[in-house]
Amino acid sequence: MIPLTHYLILSGVLFAIGLMGVIVRRDIIVIFMCLEMMLSAANLSLVAFSRAQGTMGLPNYDGQALSIFILTIAAAEVAIGLALIVSLYRARRTASTQDLNTLKD
């Protein structure tokens, strides 16, 4: 059985990579993908904690159920976010965050 710390370290590394992508990158689609990576890292830690909390040898499935619910909500978020990004690209012919300031005009 893999220890809980390995899952949490992996989750932390994935979250840090996603956070760095959000901070450093300028392309909206890449930022969106990094946000989804951060959400997946949070789901991984949630499932890992749920697995480690099992009582009397039986696994606790609360974390898995919540993770599936979060993934369902994230799918709707992806659909709406990509629709907004495509709409922005059609209007401005760019997907860079530096050009978003022109939306104020």
Curated annotation (Swiss-Prot):
| Any one Gene Ontology BP term | ATP synthesis coupled electron transport
Catalytic function, reaction form: a quinone + NADH + 5 H(+)(in) = a quinol + NAD(+) + 4 H(+)(out)
Gene Ontology terms, cellular component aspect?
Answer: NADH dehydrogenase complex; plasma membrane
**Bilayer topology term:** Multi-pass membrane protein
Q: Which cysteines are joined by disulfide bonds?
A: none
User: Taxonomically, which superkingdom?
Assistant: Bacteria
Recite the UniProt keywords alphabetically: Cell inner membrane, Cell membrane, Membrane, NAD, Quinone, Translocase, Transmembrane, Transmembrane helix, Transport, Ubiquinone
Glycosyltransferase among keywords: no
Q: Which residues cross the membrane?
A: 4-24, 28-48, 66-86
Q: Where in the cell is it found?
A: Cell inner membrane
EC code: 7.1.1.-
EC category name: translocase
Q: Name one Pfam family in it.
A: Oxidored_q2
Q: Which InterPro entries match?
A: NADH_UbQ_OxRdtase_chain4L/K, NUOK/Mnh_C1-like
Which molecular function GO terms apply here?
A: NADH:ubiquinone reductase (non-electrogenic) activity; quinone binding
- HAMAP family assigned to the protein according to its UniProt record, in alphabetical order: NDH1_NuoK
Q: Which family does it belong to?
A: Belongs to the complex I subunit 4L family.
Alphabetized PANTHER family for the sequence: NADH DEHYDROGENASE SUBUNIT 4L-RELATED (PTHR11434:SF21), NADH-UBIQUINONE OXIDOREDUCTASE SUBUNIT ND4L (PTHR11434)
Query: What is the stated purpose of this protein?
Result: NDH-1 shuttles electrons from NADH, via FMN and iron-sulfur (Fe-S) centers, to quinones in the respiratory chain. The immediate electron acceptor for the enzyme in this species is believed to be ubiquinone. Couples the redox reaction to proton translocation (for every two electrons transferred, four hydrogen ions are translocated across the cytoplasmic membrane), and thus conserves the redox energy in a proton gradient.
**Quaternary structure, from the entry:** NDH-1 is composed of 14 different subunits. Subunits NuoA, H, J, K, L, M, N constitute the membrane sector of the complex.
The protein here is known as: NADH-quinone oxidoreductase subunit K
Q: Which species? A: Akkermansia muciniphila (strain ATCC BAA-835 / DSM 22959 / JCM 33894 / BCRC 81048 / CCUG 64013 / CIP 107961 / Muc)
